[in-house]
UniProtKB/Swiss-Prot annotation:
SMART domains xref list: PKS_AT, PKS_KR, PKS_KS, PKS_PP, PKS_PP_betabranch
Record's keyword annotation contains Cytoplasm: no
Residues of the active site: C178, H313, H353, S625
SUPFAM superfamilies: ACP-like (SSF47336), FabD/lysophospholipase-like (SSF52151), NAD(P)-binding Rossmann-fold domains (SSF51735), Probable ACP-binding domain of malonyl-CoA ACP transacylase (SSF55048), Thiolase-like (SSF53901)
Residues recorded as bearing O-(pantetheine 4'-phosphoryl)serine in the entry: S1076
Region listing for Malonyl-CoA:ACP transacylase (MAT) domain, in residue ranges: 539-796
Domain Ketosynthase family 3 (KS3): 7-430
Protein name in UniProt: Cluster 41 polyketide synthase
Amino acid sequence: MEANDSPHDVAVVGMGCRLPGNNNTPEELWRSILQKVDASSEIPRMRWEPYQQNAQNARSIGKVPRRGYFVKNLENFDAGFFNISPKEAEQMDPQQRLVLEVTWEALENAGIPLSSLSGSDAAVFMGVNSDDYGKLLLEDLPHVEPWMGIGTAYCGVANRISYHLNLMGPSTAVDAACASSLVAIHLGRQAILSGESKVAIVGGVNAIFGPGLTSVLDKAGALSSDGRCHSFDDAASGYGRGEGAAVVILKNMAEAVKDGDHILATLKGTAVAQDGRTNGIMAPNQKAQELVARKALDVARVDASTIDYVEAHATSTPVGDPTEVSAISAVYGKGRSPDKPCYIGSVKPNVGHLEAGAGAVGFIKAVMSVQKGILPPQANLKTLNTRVNWSEGVQVVQDIEDWPSSGYPRRAGVCSYGYGGTVSHAIIEKYIQTGPAIYSKEQWPKGTQVLLLSSPQRRSLETQAATQAEWMSTVGKQNDLRCVAATLGTRRSHHKYRAAFVVESHDDAAEKLNAFACQTPTKWTTSGGKPEGDDRPVVWVFSGHGAQWTDMAKDLLQYRVFRDVIESVDILVQKEMGFSAIQAMEMGVLNGSDQVQVLTYLMQIGLSEVLRSLGVSCGAVIGHSVGEIAASVAAGCITPAEGTLIVTRRAKLYRRFMGAGGMALVCAPLEQITIEISTQNVNNLVVAINSSPSSCVVSGPKEEIEAFALNLNNKGIKTIHVDTDIAFHHPMLGELMEPLAEALVGYVSPSQSKVAIYSTSASDPRSTMDRGIRYWLDNMVNPVQLTSAISAAAEDASPLAPIIKKILSMESRGATIQAIAIDISSHDAASQLSSRIDDLCFPPIRGVVHAAGVLHNEHVLSVTPDSFERVLAPKIAGSLTLNMLFPPKTVDFMVLFSSCGQFFGFPGQASYASGNAFLDALATYRRSQGDNTIAMQWTSWREIGMAAGSEFVRAELATKGITDISQEEAFQAWMHVSKYDVDHAVVLRSRALEKHEPLPSPLLVDIAIHKISSILTPPPTPPLSASSDLLPLPRNPADRFDSLSRQVRECVANVLQMETDEVASQEPLSNMGMDSVMTVHLRGRLQKSLGVLVPPNLTWSHPSIDHIVKWLMEKTNDKE
């Protein structure tokens, strides 16, 4: 059988749909098709209600066909899931809402986490041809709102998907009438093959909200009198309109194979054309339909005789069906024997004619047919159309049939035609896997599994659990529980709110999921929000000898990934050691210390790959004794084969010492045990491992270890025997160094580490020594410095680590850095500092920088003498101390770190501004004495300094259009200012620089005007809002906060059209759907409710309700 190996092939990896008859998944649609279900019904009562208000329209509506194929509860939409406010959702065409949800479902069906697509070149092409909802909204002129533009535009159907999923590839709505969605599939295939995109989201949508187009189609003779489709039937007289959405996920074939995607089918070729001038623009053209099919076959590079099934457009019109069947017969039926016809069918009698979405629905049906090997039966077919010649090699599928057997892969064609003349065709083929599956259930152990669910909203978890429970107890039983767990764990986006279920079977899973949905979770269920800081890199620590246990790795062998790793080096193990690692692990046998060393290493490298396959990675590695070999493999320093040679050849040499040595874990610090060894005169013992600050491991001859351990236990020092008969890391192993070096010559070629690696063999845990032969000789004999390695890793993860590295770098270049800790504001600070400087014997100090400060935000009326002094002390007393020690003209420069905050009058910073004003005055004084002193009035420094940790300060600066500066920019400003004879310099960074806009001129014009105005005229009494009966705010701070929080929540809820209890105080407003237009309305409501002037960028600088309330606390305090 031929394989899918053409470079023109595109993988179909996911599908989703929302169709009439509660067909909300492709599987539900398939079952409906097999059962010949006709999902037609009366139109929902409320759909045309707005048109009933006009008497003339109401009379005409009675003549419009009321039957068709409709989606129930089309008004339902989980707006919060997509961070869309209810207000904006109300003004979005339901077609946009529908494709958002179905696209999400299709991507989940594809097993593509949304995070993996964010920022990618993924394309979106969506067919759309109806704007019923837009007419309803935009023709109601008095109530037109800003969101109705994008909310009703065709482009919004595709663009919203790209926007909400953060996709950067092409994004286009496609209007080719009833061919729209198959044309979208064609464009998606082209985008992938051209290299423009790796993934394409394609499909179409239709929603019926007005009688206009239905009336047009009825008068044109396109609709059936009973609102049903009767494809290929002699009674066919038109179609029944259908609504819904169908979405298909296409992917570059090579990428899909590499990523281990579940490929549903292969898209071999597509073609799009126009039928030109015919008897009328809406009349079909048989020749054009034939030509586009032949073109698709040419693109697919397959012969028409290998196509066993064609999913026809088949709109049930008197002219359309005979024309299309004739075209299919001419292309696919020619030369076929009566017993091997080309089968045809159409999905329209099941779910209606979705017009712009019709082609994608037919495509989904055809994919499922080639995938399952079943030809599905035709619904609503009683008598074959007598206007068709059925003896020309085609046959309608009337009952469920197995796909005909042949010597080629199952292949199908899909037709879709638009009434404007667009004709389109696609060729699909069963996907044939040519190599071993990258991901399969064999990777996962049988038995207990963990099922993971997550959602952006807490309440949605219970709904998800109920849906999953129903699936588990029905169609989900056909799926291996291991595969279900793997998909939920590794091929889903993981959101803020999560739940995990430990399950033994499908029934057990359904029971626990249902219990969670009913808010009665069992003890084997856990849920909660995503923990903060869980994205920090982790350190993998590889244990040493003694951590082994019986049956170690036995269960892990059920993981395909783990077994592959062990099998890849098992031949080496057999050759070097004389036993099979696979067999030893399967039997759970550990024979001797030499075998334990090897199996411990193999266990570790296998487990590393299992973790990586589950998406777990490390930021650094540490190896304990023999664990350093596996750690080096995990870090990429050596290959698994090199590590195997090191551990096996060393293990063979260890055999010389087996039975002669021993080790003991002592629950006491290394320093204490070193003294014990000395006082007990057991000089053959050494501390081999510094395990932790409170424990260590002693190594030496067997008898002496046993006697030493007994003595320590008698003294009350707990000592535990280590399961080994070799004295690892003892000097006696020194005689093995030369033979080990000879055994490894030419077999180890170390590489640069791909992650941080901390040494436990070198004296410096951060040693960059390569993992060559010399390193492994040291690893065998040197003591294990585990405590030092862990401490180094912990230090390097600290925020101080970069600063320490900078200091060390400066010292390596000859600088001497000395920290002196004193209270610069104390009365004797000058004498303390002078004495300490003298002790250092430094050369004369030539420059001084004063950067001390305390930030304590407090309303001016709440300032106490103590709090005022606490803020002023480092500024005033500290600078006076330096002025006393280094009088004017005794140093080359003095720089005083002041702040720009005093210019802007930040609420709550009166004390801080006073302290900085003193620094400014001191700079002026020293300059007047001929000294080179300057006060730098800084904006916030990025990631350093007091303001860097203050969201309040950043937000206040942002209202002035000012951003923070990097350290590099700060020092550049400092160097620049030092060229001028000035006592003060204000350093600011305008946001205009980031937007490449011209700077405001003058930069601080608003401050200047404010200061001049305040001098010339008394401040006016601020007017109350139009509603002069503003509610007074409580004076108690806690009550005031609660009152403001309630009022802000009400304002936000009103703007977003949400219930007040649905508005989360700590959630960013943008996550609830607040956009730039809504912030204007919110600003107006806040000003009216609270009588406070609100800046235009309030929600940008104060992104949540809590942030806004904190800001209002300051502003309303100022009003008292």
